[in-house]
């Protein structure tokens, strides 16, 4: 009897002790031992109960039948209220058998599954479906070990849980630092409850305790973790884990104690110091924002009203899928709405193509803090978050500063900002690409001439160095283009006192090179009644005559021979008197042609003041100030000075033909130079590739470790040089394409300005001289100017309303788009 009493007391004390352990934070080994002990206690009490029941039933006598029937009815009446649990005994047992444990432990601790008093009617089979050990796989660890909220007043409200089987649970928890069922944030803001286990230095997430392969396996070495606490309907606790080479992980916990416990374990595993209990400014790298949405103030944690189950409670595993189905649509819709709000509330200008702001880790008082850093106006600004509502520290002036990469094993992508050797700030990026991007930004804003390739990068991985250098060059180039890219329509606008067109300068420069003195030309040009200084444009109707030959002679002038009139286009005077002493052959049709041109002068107002500009053509004309309409042909033996003057006075020279030819020549030479440079780069690339191939073959055959290390270093250098040359080749190809396009436009001539030739006007003036002019001698044939202009390849540009400049700009915009 004493042994049974001692056993009864042992069971009671052991059950109380296990209940106390449920309230404590245990190590993984203690948790495993406690679970095994609880399982053994359950099996023992169940097996001993059945033996006692068997003995008890066999000892019933006829005289005690009434008592036995009353005892059989008692559990039958109380069974619906206790879900098959043992009721309180109404009377002492008939035999001196071990009593059941006190009834106070039965409703509160169902994990032990205290044996039930069964009856012959088969209540054992009916009570079996009510056992929670069959259906509560997914909630055991979370509720039994860590799920104790500050606001949880009654534990009887939450459903009891336990591990489904020792082979499923203990195997996952073996050698674990900590484990629990936690909410994990998934794609598009959905939450899923998973078994989270930290073993060694890795975080493992299982869909249920029966799974043997984790859905998520991430190394926590070097990762940062932040605890965020919100007061929405109930306190929400989230841990945001940022691994080095993986997506951000957000875990939802049910109490502050549980969150602090997990935070402490993760910090011990990662080896990073704490960033504060409720630091809320941790960030997500750009490459990870696509797969994991950033936590925002507008995002709501999965609460009881949204999912139909309390946060501090734990739904049954069969209901988990239904919960997800109920909540997934609402989460997706609310998340999409939140994404729209994020875009609308962003303070960044929408037209900015170069990103000059992002989150960086900043070393503050020997601790790394996440700050929103922004570069503008040669200053680096630090903010608490991306809303820029609160400045974290004073802005840093970047003028005259140096940027130096300073990687370390714990902070691979850190760099320093120095001024005269003194460290002003130490920053850390999240990836090699982001580090290169910021190096380029800071180099551009500081005015440093240092090339990103000149930095010393203490990395073994050549790809990482190449990524940093490439990103730095890209951001540096974009910053330079942002402030120095020319704009055709706003840069270099002509001033009021400046001449309007470039063709004026062409005329003056050509005359100066021809050796003509402007002082002597002034009396001839300033004729009475000709106050207009702009003589670049020609009126279409009183047009100059063009000759078939390559050289032409000017009509004689009453001025002395030593005075050379300037090569300007003058308005046509009404009469002209050729000098009789000039040995020129006059055409007999000159008076008729003169009358024809004089008769056309009244038609000039009908053209609306239209002026044309001669752009191209091989014919040359030389109008005289006194006799511009006299057409003559010079014999083949003309003197060289006359030819020089004719060349200088050519309208093509005055009106831009040589300018077009000069552009064609310049673009042609530029294209040839770039082609030659491209061939040199190709040859160098081929040589580098041969050298790389030979190094690889030598490295495969090499057995000496020292020589192999030097060969590997040389191979990395050659590989990096190949990448640099390949980028140069690509840039050169793009430059060649641009030069070819410019050359094609230059060869097309001024027609690309979008103007057209008014052929109807040319045809209206051409029939009259044809009818009135007989066939002259071959050596003195006058040329009808309108016919010559019509036959020339679009050399005269006629516009109806004087909108040449407007059409030119429209055409340039069309070509640019």
Curated annotation (Swiss-Prot):
Residues 754-763 have a biased composition (Polar residues). Residues 63-164, 512-657, 754-786 are annotated as: Disordered. Gene3D superfamilies: Pleckstrin-homology domain (PH domain)/Phosphotyrosine-binding domain (PTB). Residues 123-139 have a biased composition (Acidic residues). One of its GO terms (molecular function) is protein tyrosine kinase activator activity. The modification Phosphotyrosine is found at residues 56, 413. GO terms for biological process: inflammatory response; positive regulation of DNA-templated transcription; positive regulation of epidermal growth factor receptor signaling pathway; regulation of mitotic cell cycle. InterPro entries: AFAP, PH-like_dom_sf, PH_domain. The modification Phosphoserine is found at residues 408, 484. Residues 512-528, 767-782 have a biased composition (Low complexity). SMART domains: PH. GO terms for cellular component: cytosol. Keywords: Coiled coil, Cytoplasm, Phosphoprotein, Repeat. Residues 652-748 form a coiled coil. Residues 175-271, 353-447 form the PH domain. It is found in: Cytoplasm. Its main location: cytoplasm. CDD domains: PH1_AFAP (cd13306), PH2_AFAP (cd13307). Tyrosine phosphorylated (by SRC). Interacts with SRC. Interacts with LCK when tyrosine phosphorylated. May play a role in a signaling cascade by enhancing the kinase activity of SRC. Contributes to SRC-regulated transcription activation. This is Actin filament-associated protein 1-like 2.
């Amino acid at each position: 009897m004493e042994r049974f009493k001692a056993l009864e007391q042992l069971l009671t004390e052991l059950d109380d002790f296990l209940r106390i352990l449920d309230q404590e934070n245990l190590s993984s080994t203690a948790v495993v031992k406690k679970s095994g002990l609880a399982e053994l206690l359950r099996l023992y009490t169940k097996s001993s109960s059945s033996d006692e029941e068997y003995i008890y039933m066999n000892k019933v006598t006829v005289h005690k039948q009434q008592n036995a029937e009353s005892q059989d009815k008692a559990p039958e009446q109380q069974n619906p209220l206790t879900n098959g649990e043992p009721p309180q005994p109404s009377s002492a047992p008939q035999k001196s058998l071990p009593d059941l444990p006190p009834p106070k432990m039965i409703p509160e601790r169902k994990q032990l599954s205290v044996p039930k008093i069964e009856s012959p009617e088969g209540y054992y089979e009916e009570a079996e479906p009510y056992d929670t050990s069959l259906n509560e796989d997914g909630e055991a660890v979370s509720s039994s070990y860590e799920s104790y909220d500050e606001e949880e007043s009654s534990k009887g409200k939450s459903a009891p849980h336990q591990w489904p089987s020792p082979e499923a649970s203990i195997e996952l928890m073996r050698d674990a630092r900590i484990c629990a069922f936690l909410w994990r944030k998934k794609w598009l803001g959905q939450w899923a409850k998973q078994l989270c286990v930290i073993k060694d230095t890795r975080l493992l997430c299982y869909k249920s305790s029966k799974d043997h392969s984790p859905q998520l396996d991430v190394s926590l070495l070097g990762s940062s973790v932040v605890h965020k606490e919100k007061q929405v309907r109930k306190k929400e606790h989230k841990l945001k884990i940022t691994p080095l080479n993986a997506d951000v992980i957000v875990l939802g916990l049910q109490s502050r104690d549980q969150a602090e416990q997990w935070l402490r374990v993760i910090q011990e595993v990662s080896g990073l110091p704490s960033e504060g209990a409720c630091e809320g400014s941790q960030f997500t790298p750009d490459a990870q924002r696509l797969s994991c949405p950033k936590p925002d103030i507008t995002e709501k944690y999965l609460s009881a009203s949204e999912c139909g189950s309390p946060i501090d409670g734990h739904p049954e595993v069969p209901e988990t899928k239904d919960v997800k189905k109920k909540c997934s649509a609402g989460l997706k819709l609310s998340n999409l709405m939140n994404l729209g709000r994020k875009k609308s509330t962003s303070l960044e200008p929408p037209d900015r193509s170069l990103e000059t702001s992002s989150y960086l880790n900043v070393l503050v008082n020997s601790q790394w803090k996440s700050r929103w850093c922004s570069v503008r106006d040669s200053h680096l600004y630090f903010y608490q978050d991306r809303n820029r509502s609160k400045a974290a520290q004073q802005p840093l002036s970047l003028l005259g500063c140096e940027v130096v990469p300073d990687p370390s094993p714990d902070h691979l992508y850190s760099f320093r900002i120095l001024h005269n050797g003194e460290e002003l700030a130490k920053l850390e990026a999240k990836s090699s690409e982001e580090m290169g991007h910021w190096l380029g930004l800071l180099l551009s804003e500081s005015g440093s001439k240092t090339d990103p390739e000149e930095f010393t990068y203490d990395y073994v991985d050549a790809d990482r160095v190449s990524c940093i250098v490439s990103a730095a060059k890209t951001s540096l180039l974009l910053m330079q283009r942002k402030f120095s890219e020319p704009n055709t329509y706003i840069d270099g606008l002509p001033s009021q006192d400046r001449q309007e067109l470039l063709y004026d300068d062409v005329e003056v420069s050509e005359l100066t090179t021809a050796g003509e003195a402007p002082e002597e030309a002034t009396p001839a040009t300033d004729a009475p009644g000709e106050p207009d200084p702009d003589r670049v444009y020609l009126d279409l109707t009183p047009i100059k005559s063009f000759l078939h030959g390559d050289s032409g002679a000017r009509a004689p002038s009453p001025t002395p021979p030593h005075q050379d009139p300037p090569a300007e286009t003058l308005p046509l005077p009404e009469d002209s008197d050729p000098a009789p002493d000039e040995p020129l052959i006059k055409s007999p049709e000159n008076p008729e042609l003169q009358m024809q041109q004089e008769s056309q002068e009244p038609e000039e107002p009908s053209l609306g003041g239209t002026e044309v500009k001669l752009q191209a053509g091989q014919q040359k004309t030389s109008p005289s100030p006194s006799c511009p309409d006299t057409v003559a042909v010079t014999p083949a033996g003309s003197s060289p000075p006359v030819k020089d003057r004719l060349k200088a006075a050519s309208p093509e020279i005055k009106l831009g033909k040589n300018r077009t030819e000069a552009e064609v020549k310049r673009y042609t030479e530029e294209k040839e130079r770039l082609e030659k440079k491209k061939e040199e780069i190709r040859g160098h690339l081929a040589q580098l590739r041969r050298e790389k191939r030979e190094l690889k073959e030598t490295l495969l055959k090499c057995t000496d470790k020292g020589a192999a290390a030097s060969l590997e270093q040389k191979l990395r250098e050659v590989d990096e040089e190949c990448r640099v040359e390949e980028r140069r080749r690509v840039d050169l190809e793009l430059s060649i394409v641009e030069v070819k396009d410019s050359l094609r436009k230059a060869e097309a001539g001024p027609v690309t300005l979008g103007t057209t030739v008014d052929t109807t006007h040319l045809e209206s003036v051409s029939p009259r001289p044809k009818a009135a002019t007989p066939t002259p001698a071959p050596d003195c044939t006058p040329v009808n100017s309108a016919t010559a202009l019509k036959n020339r390849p679009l050399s005269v540009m006629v516009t109806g309303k004087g909108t040449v400049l407007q059409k030119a700009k429209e055409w340039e915009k069309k070509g640019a788009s």
